[in-house]
């Protein structure tokens, strides 16, 4: 789950990590009220969407007067914004964050994440903040420093001071940096996070460090014990079909192709998409209907797939280990009847009660195309889509 900047800053502040004073507003007049409550300007007005790169998209404005604040908020609120991170998708701007704006002396980068390569929690820091860390890694890798955390020792003050001096900070600032690192580790563990990125972590004109922006990513597998984080979810920033799928407990990800996929098992689902591409097609989605799929879940899965008008064909690829193929067949037949499927449907069944399942499909009288294996199914759905065009 992703978070808005203002939510990230609330969490950072709760754990003693300095952030500029600020508050969200949903109207231009409210933005002015927030600015006045923060005291004398200047201020920053920042559009709240689940994406970085807002500055280049016009979503971050420096304001010297309250008239500037009102104008900036008026221009952002109620609009839709896309950045280089949204892949062309426009996200609604329902809130703006108004904060104090100090003069930036130096921008740093600091993040903490789960490093799958080293199987540890890892800090990454750089003296080059305010830009994409991937760009720094490609152009000046010597400016990036990392620390793999020992789970027994944890993070100590000396780790942070060592990092701080490597980044060119003075003794006072290195001490602040150490405090931020230690507190960030507590936050990371307490909230079951997968990533916290502070970019930039800035030195302002008062000589102190502040987190000017924060990006959080939580571990959805821990959502059951993080009710406060779940309550922060903003579904307006997410793909509508993916939101519906999550409510049905179906693993679904929208993609750009035209061949819908319904598969049981994440590994088989990924393999199915690969084979479709190898046969010249483009998958429209990742959909893992789950090992405990039943007739109703199959119907709901078809509805999810066909909610996209880009879908021109469907490939159902089921290996019946826990799930029974005859039950899947009943679900497919019911879905075709209930949803009114008008695109080619190719079905590959294998496993428990496979012959009964295939017989049900044959007896249905529906134009369902059978497939012998995954490659045969991918070829047939690609050909069927081409022939139907």
Curated annotation (Swiss-Prot):
Q: Which of the seven top EC classes does this enzyme belong to?
A: ligase
Please, one GO biological process term?
Answer: tricarboxylic acid cycle
UniProt catalytic activity: succinate + ATP + CoA = succinyl-CoA + ADP + phosphate; GTP + succinate + CoA = succinyl-CoA + GDP + phosphate
Q: Which UniProt keywords apply?
A: ATP-binding, Ligase, Magnesium, Metal-binding, Nucleotide-binding, Tricarboxylic acid cycle
Tell me how the cofactor is bound: Binds 1 Mg(2+) ion per subunit.
GO cellular component assignments:
succinate-CoA ligase complex
Which GO terms of the molecular function aspect are on file? ATP binding; magnesium ion binding; succinate-CoA ligase (ADP-forming) activity; succinate-CoA ligase (GDP-forming) activity
Domain annotation ATP-grasp: ranges: 9-244
Record's subunit section: Heterotetramer of two alpha and two beta subunits.
Family as reported in the entry's similarity comment: Belongs to the succinate/malate CoA ligase beta subunit family.
Q: What is this protein called?
A: Succinate--CoA ligase [ADP-forming] subunit beta
In its UniProt entry, the species of origin is given as Xanthomonas campestris pv. campestris (strain B100)
What lineage is on file?
Answer: Bacteria, Pseudomonadati, Pseudomonadota, Gammaproteobacteria, Lysobacterales
């Amino acid at each position: 789950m992703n978070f808005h900047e203002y939510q990230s800053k609330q969490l950072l502040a709760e754990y003693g990590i300095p952030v500029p004073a600020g508050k969200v507003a949903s109207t231009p007049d409210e933005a002015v009220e927030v600015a006045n409550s923060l005291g004398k300007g200047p201020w920053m007005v920042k559009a709240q969407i689940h994406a970085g790169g807002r500055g280049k998209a016009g979503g971050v404005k420096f304001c010297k007067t309250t008239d500037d604040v009102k104008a900036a908020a008026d221009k952002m609120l109620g609009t839709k914004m896309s950045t280089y991170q949204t892949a062309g998708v426009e996200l609604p701007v329902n809130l703006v964050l108004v904060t104090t704006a100090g003069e930036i002396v130096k921008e740093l980068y600091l993040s903490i994440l789960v490093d799958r390569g080293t199987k540890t929690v890892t800090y990454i820091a750089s003296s080059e903040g305010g830009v994409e860390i991937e760009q720094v890694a490609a152009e000046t890798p010597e400016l990036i420093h990392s620390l793999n955390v020992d789970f027994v020792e944890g993070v100590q003050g000396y780790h942070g001071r060592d990092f701080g001096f490597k980044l060119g900070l003075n003794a006072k600032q290195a001490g602040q940096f150490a405090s931020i690192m230690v507190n960030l580790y507590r936050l990371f563990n307490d909230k079951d996070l997968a990533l916290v990125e502070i970019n930039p972590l800035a030195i302002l004109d008062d000589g102190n460090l502040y987190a000017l922006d924060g990006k959080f990513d939580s571990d959805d597998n821990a959502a059951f014990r993080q009710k406060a984080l779940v309550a922060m979810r903003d579904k307006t920033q997410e793909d509508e079909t993916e939101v519906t799928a999550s409510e049905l407990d179906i693993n679904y990800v929208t993609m750009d192709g035209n061949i819908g996929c319904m598969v049981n098992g994440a590994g088989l689902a990924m393999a199915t998409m690969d084979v479709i591409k190898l046969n010249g097609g483009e998958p429209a989605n990742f959909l893992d209907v789950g090992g405990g799929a039943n007739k109703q879940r199959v119907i709901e899965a078809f509805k999810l797939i066909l909610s996209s008008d880009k879908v021109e064909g469907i490939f159902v690829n089921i290996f019946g280990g826990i799930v029974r193929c005859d039950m899947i067949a009943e679900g497919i037949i019911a879905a075709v009847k209930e949803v009114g499927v008008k695109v080619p449907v190719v079905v590959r069944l294998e496993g428990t009660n496979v012959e009964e399942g295939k017989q049900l499909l044959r007896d249905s009288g529906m134009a369902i195309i059978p497939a012998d294996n995954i490659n045969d199914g991918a070829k047939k759905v690609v050909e069927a889509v081409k022939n139907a065009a």
